Swiss-Prot record:
Originating species: Selaginella moellendorffii (Spikemoss)
Family: Belongs to the glycosyltransferase 78 family.
Name the record gives this protein: Mannosylglycerate synthase
Taxon lineage: Eukaryota, Viridiplantae, Streptophyta, Embryophyta, Tracheophyta
Known role: Involved in the biosynthesis of the compatible solute alpha-D-mannosyl-glycerate (MG). Catalyzes the condensation of GDP-alpha-D-mannose (GDP-Man) with D-glycerate to produce alpha-D-mannosyl-glycerate. Can also use GDP-alpha-D-glucose (GDP-Glc) as sugar donor to produce alpha-D-glucopyranosyl-glycerate (GG).
A UniProt-annotated Pfam family: MGS_GT
Length: 422
């Protein structure tokens, strides 16, 4: 039998309770574990409903406050998920653990069933993926997937559809592989999804991805400022791994086919554009200006400084972002306020550029642009690593980080699209 875990903070109580009831009623589930960040209103609501849910389903509903497992980073999502892993590993009668965000309005029993069916085929990890708005998942596309393309282009990492997704199933083998790794236990913040995904592949686990056609309907953020901490922590997690090697041709990766995207998803805007436009004009310091001038492409530096005076985003195209990403991998310093704000501003510029150039042309055009960016970046990085391998003694497993300083120093010829240089 399986355990289903819902990590939570303060959420819509009715949604959380409904999801707990749904999971508890599933025939493959024996225990529902609710891991709370704190004992607030949501905790009290689950506690009040627990007796009736247990009585009606015959299943155990466990409430557990997340423990401080990582000690060097901010306590957040990572501590919550790792608290659940520790509980699962201590209860050997449980064979699989599912994770689902507690605020998902569209959650249903089918999510559990689809994951269980793939695990029955001896996959160690089953991840859920969804149709997403063309302006949603901007950290996934521009931070995680690009990082995987640049650093490990010949592995399956660039091709995992939603590597930051919090909806997944782990077998006991996979849970042990993750929790016994000190890097996982130390990643107490938003970077935990990056670590889970990376280590699953590094350790050769067998991975399946199942498609949820109705999408993940949950609370959206208002402006991109709300995502600043997540952005910094996800990028920092990627940077911490840049010298790691990943064996090639180990493990398997299978994906379920997609379905037509619902119109509601196609029409949704993932963030407040008007609020976001103001972000490039605020919180500037001389330190940020100095870092920008010292380390980055002059075209990007000029464009971002112009954006501090008036709305402009044409400078932050795909080439500019990839070049900036390489520089950030080498020089970014987590905890330095100027570096963190500069990372945020460059990323905001990229998101606005994508929105105005591609999303306004329609959903299909926007998704095609995102997928093309990943495909081209992966291919170019793979060719670069192939060239480097011919002159390097490491021939099995690699990290591309040794090429970063050289590439970061190369200046590209800027091709400005006049239509988007507003």
């Amino acid at each position: 039998m399986s355990l289903v875990c819902f990590p939570f903070k303060e959420e819509d109580v009715a949604v959380v309770v409904r999801n707990v009831e749904c999971a508890a009623a599933h025939p493959r589930v024996s225990t529902v574990l609710c891991v709370g960040y704190s004992k607030g209103e949501t905790w009290c609501a689950i506690e009040a409903k627990r007796p009736s849910i247990e009585s009606s389903t015959g299943k155990r509903i466990i409430l557990l406050q997340q423990k401080r497992i990582g000690v060097s980073l901010r306590s957040g999502k990572g501590d919550g998920m790792n608290t659940a892993l520790a509980y699962f590993l201590d209860h050997t009668e449980l064979k699989r653990i599912h994770f689902y965000d507690s605020d998902i309005v569209s959650f249903s029993a089918d999510w559990i069933t689809k994951a269980e069916r793939q695990a029955d085929l001896d996959f160690d990890v089953v991840r859920h993926y969804f149709p997403r708005s063309s302006t949603d998942a901007m950290i996934t596309w521009f931070v995680t997937k690009i990082g995987f393309c640049l650093l490990w282009p010949k592995t399956v990492l660039p091709f995992i559809e939603q590597p930051l997704g919090g909806e997944l199933l782990l077998t006991r083998k996979a849970a042990e592989a993750l929790y016994t790794d000190h890097r996982v236990r130390g990643q107490s913040d938003w970077g935990i999804d990056t670590l889970y995904t990376f280590i699953m592949v590094q350790k050769g686990l067998h991975l399946a991805e199942v498609y949820i056609p109705e999408g993940k309907v949950h609370a959206l953020y208002s402006g991109l400022r709300d995502l600043r901490t997540m952005l910094v922590e996800c990028f920092s997690a990627m940077q911490s791994l840049k010298d790691e090697a990943v064996p090639l041709n180990e493990g398997t990766h299978r994906m379920e086919y997609t379905r037509p995207v619902p119109e509601l998803v196609k029409q949704k805007v993932g963030y407040d554009v008007e609020k976001t436009l103001k972000l490039l004009r605020s919180n500037w310091t001389q330190g940020q200006r100095d870092l920008l001038q010292k380390h980055f492409d002059p075209a990007l530096a000029k464009g971002l400084l112009n954006a501090s005076e008036w709305p402009t985003w044409g400078f932050a195209d795909e080439e500019a972002w990839v070049a900036a990403y390489r520089t950030l991998l080498v020089h970014f310093e987590k905890g330095d306020e100027d570096w963190e704000e500069l990372l945020f501003k460059i990323w905001v510029s990229r998101v606005l550029n994508h929105t105005m150039r591609h999303s306004l042309r329609g959903y299909d055009a926007a998704l095609d642009a995102l997928r093309s960016l990943i495909w081209e970046t992966q291919h170019q990085s793979a060719m670069l690593s192939k060239s480097a391998a011919a002159n390097h003694h490491i021939v099995s497993g690699h990290s591309a980080s040794e090429a970063l300083p050289r590439t970061a120093g190369q200046l590209r010829e800027k091709r400005m699209d006049a239509a988007c240089a507003v």
